[in-house]
Design a protein with these regions (language model features):
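A short coil-to-beta-strand element that immediately follows conserved catalytic motifs
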Residues: 81-91
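A generic structural micro-feature
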Residues: 6-8, 102-108, 126-129
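Active-site-adjacent beta-strand/loop module that shapes the phosphate/pyrophosphate-binding cleft
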Residues: 91-121
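Conserved N-terminal beta-strand and adjoining loop/helix that marks the start
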Residues: 1-38, 55, 59-60, 113
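Nudix hydrolase/Nudix homology domain
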Residues: 119-148
Length: 148
């Protein structure tokens, strides 16, 4: 049995969702064809630049929970305030770069949705974010990261 050393990198992703303007409000958190998601156009990050990605995301910092990360990144990247009670867990994804025996970097990505916040989402890190835009969940732009 081969021994591997590895690093586990946890991250939080927060998708802001809203009904399309003029459409009825979704009931009980249901997602419909009129639901829109806020995406950011990545730039100058060294990873997936030129892709439309999650509105707010980032790595968990030392002594921080994934929920605390989600709240912090939403505030830092979009300038909106949210309470932990408003975050809805969506899914988790494990990713790895195992290339057959090398040291592994493993990632665990935790995804949340958010339907209520205080403030208007805005680009707060223009060096990394070329713009924000709402898209229909049934008509996403290209390209988007494969894991998002």
């Amino acid at each position: 049995m081969a021994a591997h050393s590895f690093t586990l990198v946890p991250a939080a992703y927060v998708y802001l969702l809203r009904p399309a303007p003029g459409s009825p409000r979704d009931r009980d958190g249901a997602v419909s064809a009129s639901t829109q998601v806020l995406l950011q156009l990545r730039r100058n990050t060294g990873y997936m630049d030129g892709h439309w990605a999650c509105g707010a995301s980032g790595h968990v910092e030392a002594a921080e929970s994934v929920v605390e990360t989600a709240l912090r990144e939403t505030r830092e990247e979009l300038g909106v305030s949210v309470s932990a009670a408003e975050l809805s867990p969506l899914t988790a994804m494990h990713r790895t770069n195992d290339l057959g025996g090398a040291a592994l970097e493993q990632r665990i990505d935790m995804f949340f949705t958010l339907r209520a916040w205080t403030g208007a989402p805005a680009v707060r890190e223009p060096a990394k974010n070329a713009g924000l835009r709402w898209f229909s969940l049934v008509d996403l732009p290209a390209p988007v990261p494969p894991h998002a």
